[in-house]
Amino acid sequence: MTETKTLVLIPARMAATRLPGKPLMDIAGLPMIVHVLRRAEAAAIGPVAVATDTAEIADVVTAHGGRVVMTRADHPSGSDRIFEALSKLDPDGAVETVVNLQGDFPTIQPDNIRAVLEPLADPAVDIATLAAQIHTEEESLNPNVVKVIGSPLGDRRLRALYFTRATAPWGDGPRYHHIGLYAYRRAALQRFVSLPPSPLERREKLEQLRALEAGMRIDVGIVDAVPRGVDTAADLETARRVLAH
């Protein structure tokens, strides 16, 4: 591949627990994975590829002009899948930063994809991610909404101390809804996938805790709104309404 410093990888698989086959589900005339691909391309931060173990997904992405890398089917997480894809696409190590964009974010804004790179301007940061302020009690109490607890570093940035499904932190002040978009330094991703699942990762079912427990630094950029992920049939209908206009 041509020399570049940033690569965007979109892991996609058909076997989602709550909505099987979702990458290929139609939203406003295009498969969901193609919407995500288009938004990643619009961010214009580097080459984009879909990492998948499914020929059907690969065929659709290729038919829409996208790049695909085939990966093994037995990866325990999306991070492992993107590391295999990175190793195949860039065996010589030209890529310095890898953005892991979930394949179920069809309404994500290109600005958000660009924003996830900003914390990596600090060389002390290993991994960057995003969050948005929580504004409702329902969101705050929902265990499916992952909260990030962090030390403020200016107005729009946190240094992550913990991620949890609980309602936290306690007391007055903002709470933040974590957005599952990551930018890794290459060495950080390589280290991360070499580590075994950590105790808190297993307890909370949040793989980013593996990095924190290993002493890696995760910084969080604050954005205005949470992009709508598609995990359920109701989410799919919401995305269809949003993208129909």
From Swiss-Prot:
Location, primary (coarse class): cytoplasm
Gene Ontology molecular function, alphabetical: 3-deoxy-manno-octulosonate cytidylyltransferase activity
Reactions catalysed, as given in the entry: 3-deoxy-alpha-D-manno-oct-2-ulosonate + CTP = CMP-3-deoxy-beta-D-manno-octulosonate + diphosphate
The keyword Cytoplasm appears for this protein: yes
Keyword Magnesium annotated: no
Sorted UniProt keywords: Cytoplasm, Lipopolysaccharide biosynthesis, Nucleotidyltransferase, Transferase
GO cellular component: cytosol
Reported function: Activates KDO (a required 8-carbon sugar) for incorporation into bacterial lipopolysaccharide in Gram-negative bacteria.
Name of the protein: 3-deoxy-manno-octulosonate cytidylyltransferase
Organism of this sequence: Rhodopseudomonas palustris (strain BisB18)
